[in-house]
Amino acid sequence: APQPYAFGL
């Protein structure tokens, strides 16, 4: 499943 938010954005 994809991450709800990206830390390394």
From Swiss-Prot:
Keywords: Amidation, Neuropeptide, Secreted. The modification Leucine amide is found at L9. Its main location: secreted. It is found in: Secreted. GO terms for biological process: neuropeptide signaling pathway. It comes from the Eukaryota. GO terms for cellular component: extracellular region. Belongs to the allatostatin family. May act as a neurotransmitter or neuromodulator. This is Carcinustatin-10. It comes from Carcinus maenas.
